[in-house]
Design a protein with these regions (language model features):
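Residues forming the flavin
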Residues: 1-211
Length: 211
């Protein structure tokens, strides 16, 4: 079952680099963006690192409002403000890989992610050693699947994934959906699908006190 290693020579460039900051913010979901805005406005040297190419995390897939704006519009405004700060560095496509002694963090920046032919001299990846006075972990939450038989069959999805399809990409996972959950996230999913005109045939909540 072992595959064969490629014998082709890797012509890509891989670099290492160093950076220094007052505060390293890991993750650019809502908490990370607010932390970066607060630190940036206070004049601190900030590095905001996120493993995705777009900042905002779950807000890009939600219909909620922040400060009177749709979540995605709020993200755009926040990112635009951060980009205007000379003391804030945004590192997208960057995964913080470890925390070490003396405030040192390792981070892998995938510079050429999604680029088939890189410009000459541009590395495919850069490994950063970041020296910081403090760090804030804002990695977000991970939705836990509910365990039941055959929960990995086609058509069975996590609620967050369904809302990402619907709200972020404009695609419905189906014409008729049944939703099962044990928290308010399930009701949020049912609301979004109903507002989009998708038939919600069942809303099942395991909590006795749910309304």
């Amino acid at each position: 079952g072992l595959g064969a290693l490629s014998e082709r020579y890797d012509h890509e460039l891989y670099e290492k680099a160093y950076a220094h900051c007052d505060v390293l913010i890991i993750g650019a979901e809502p908490a990370g963006l607010m932390a970066a805005l607060t630190a940036g406005r206070a004049g601190l040297d900030v590095i905001l690192a996120d493993e995705h190419d777009q900042l905002g995390g779950r807000l890009l897939s939600e219909m909620e409002h922040i400060d009177g704006m749709p979540a995605a519009a709020w993200v755009q405004a926040a990112v635009a403000e951060l980009a205007g700060f000379a003391n804030v560095r945004i590192m997208a496509n960057t995964t913080v890989t470890g925390a070490y002694d003396q405030g040192v963090f390792g981070a892998l920046e995938r510079v050429g992610l999604g680029v088939e032919a890189l410009p000459e001299g541009l590395p495919r990846e850069t490994f950063w050693r970041i020296y910081t006075k403090g760090a804030i972990l804002c990695a977000g939450a991970l939705e836990r699947q509910i365990a039941f038989a055959n929960n990995d069959r086609p058509g069975i999805m996590a609620a967050g994934a369904m809302r990402s399809y619907l709200n972020r990409f404009g695609v419905s996972p189906g014409q008729r959906v049944a939703i099962f959950g044990n928290n308010a996230d399930a009701h949020r999913t049912a609301r979004d699908f109903a507002q989009a005109g998708v038939e919600v045939v069942a809303m099942i909540d395991s909590r006795a006190e749910a309304q």
